[in-house]
């Protein structure tokens, strides 16, 4: 989950936009282990990791507490080493969205919305309008990876965050339901939220390709949209 209070040295989105060396350093951490200098692959990985780190604690909070923390760029910072900290996301202020029945609905930091669909869509809108847009614009500008492709990758991470949160907490069906709601936001952060089944468990099939298969000896991911259903089922069965 996200922590409250930003430790010294942690980075917000605007820190990345203000300094190309800082952005490059964080991209290098995000793409550690990727044996390639192809900027389109590295950019895709970076956008995915940044979105995943932000969306995961937010999705878990919506799922478990029916509260959405404010993950706008102005209110959030990330550990410069990303996974180097077990809780790599920090919030500056405790602002949140909640439902009318929440005991803290009257708190000055609370914004009350009608239902959990509104919470899921508020996360989509915050990521789209108040966090990712200038970052994706910047990364697309130097990476030769198209904006639409990067937005698909970001949307996949939003959907995947809800699916994984549901699996991790024993609420798989609810996680899938919220994933579909979150994916129904306005373009460019809009997707199918395709969720197949294998052995009774959800398998999120991405809308966009992460390009991992273009690495030396890189296979298609299990949730790759380029992988046909029979091959996906075979690999899942082999790994069961």
List each language-model region with its residue ranges.
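A eukaryotic "domain-start" boundary segment
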Residues: 1-21
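Hydrophobic, aromatic-lined core segments that form the binding pocket/scaffold
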Residues: 14-16, 20-200
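Cys/His-clustered metal-coordination modules, chiefly Zn-binding fingers
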Residues: 167-170, 174-240
């Amino acid at each position: 989950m996200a922590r409250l209070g930003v430790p010294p040295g942690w980075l917000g989105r605007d820190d990345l936009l203000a300094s190309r060396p800082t952005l490059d350093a964080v991209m290098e951490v995000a793409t550690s282990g990727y044996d390639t200098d192809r900027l389109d692959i590295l950019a895709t990985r970076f956008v995915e990791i940044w979105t995943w780190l932000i969306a995961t604690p937010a999705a878990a909070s919506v799922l478990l507490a029916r509260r959405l923390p404010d993950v706008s760029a102005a209110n959030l910072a990330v550990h410069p080493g990303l996974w180097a900290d077990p809780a790599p996301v920090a919030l500056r202020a405790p602002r949140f969205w909640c439902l009318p029945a929440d005991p803290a609905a009257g708190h000055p930091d609370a914004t009350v919305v009608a239902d959990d669909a509104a919470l899921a869509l508020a996360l989509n809108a915050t990521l789209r309008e108040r966090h990712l847009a200038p970052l994706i614009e910047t990364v697309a500008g130097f990476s030769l990876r198209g904006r639409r492709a990067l937005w698909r990758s970001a949307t996949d991470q939003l959907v995947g965050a809800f699916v994984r949160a549901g699996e991790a907490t024993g609420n798989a069906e609810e996680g899938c339901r919220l994933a579909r709601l979150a994916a129904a936001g306005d373009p460019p952060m809009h997707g199918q939220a395709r969720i197949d089944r294998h052995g009774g468990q959800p398998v999120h099939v991405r809308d966009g390709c992460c390009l991992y298969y273009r690495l030396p000896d890189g296979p298609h991911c299990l949730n790759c949209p380029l992988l046909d259903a029979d091959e996906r089922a075979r690999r899942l069965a082999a790994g069961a």
